[in-house]
A protein has these predicted regions:
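Accessory RNA-recognition modules of RNA-modification enzymes
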Residues: 1-223
Length: 223
């Protein structure tokens, strides 16, 4: 009572909007490499490389990484034994810039030069693959090191294998540099709608002092 509720501001096209995807990597019952998402309330991986809210390019990138692992005998991480190398694949996409970052999360503190070179070669080739019909291309290939027995996906340290250590994207007219460890809103279209509505409701005149607490990288106050 005493409140007015407005309808939710939805998306016109609620598909292919998500600019970040994290895929666990494991071993299927038949011994093959599996990439996808965890089944509900489990750590059993359901094979799925094309989620309809994610970028279409992700599936081709995952296919290349899986093939690279198979050809080079690179084992997926096993949570039970703590063995195996590849834990997750993180893919970030610049919604406004079409830049792609691929980050391999590994159970180790280093990877051999031969493996690095072959991975970079395969991934830089896929950025020009005819299967990718957009203007998007890989601008950053990274390693992230996570040797902890934890559910946390990323470790604290990263290494740049090729390209930049970040990709760039915009919210409004502000350009941001986004690393594997950056917190950045995952739905660019709705982010701008949300921030715009918040600014409208705030009704700021320029004479106020506003504290932007717990602001992350400051996207709201900079908008």
């Amino acid at each position: 009572e005493g409140y007015e509720f407005f309808p939710a501001i939805g998306m016109e096209e609620p598909f292919r909007y998500r600019n970040k995807a994290q895929y666990p990597v494991g071993t299927a019952k038949d011994g093959s490499i599996v990439m996808g998402f965890y089944a509900g309330r489990t750590h059993s991986i359901i094979s799925c490389t094309d989620c309809k809210i994610g970028a279409v390019e992700n599936q081709f990138i995952l296919a290349v990484i899986k093939s690279w692992m198979e050809l080079n005998g690179v084992a997926p991480y096993d949570e039970q034994t703590g063995r195996g190398l590849v834990r997750h694949v993180l893919i970030r996409t610049g919604f406004h810039t079409d830049e792609i970052m691929v980050c391999l999360v590994i159970n180790g503190i280093k990877m051999s030069g031969k493996l690095k070179e072959s991975l970079v070669k395969r991934l830089t080739e896929v950025s020009l693959d005819s299967d990718i019909s957009t203007d998007k291309c890989i601008k950053s290939i990274m390693l992230n090191f996570n040797t902890e027995n934890t559910n946390v996906i990323l470790g604290r340290q990263c290494e740049t294998l090729w390209g930049k250590s970040y990709i760039e994207d915009y919210i409004g007219d502000i350009k941001y540099q986004i690393s594997p460890l950056s917190f950045f809103q995952v739905n660019p279209r709705q982010t701008e709608k949300l921030y715009g509505k918040a600014l409208e409701y705030a009704g700021l005149t320029g004479s106020e002092t506003v504290w932007d607490l717990y602001c992350g990288i400051g996207t709201i106050s900079l908008f």
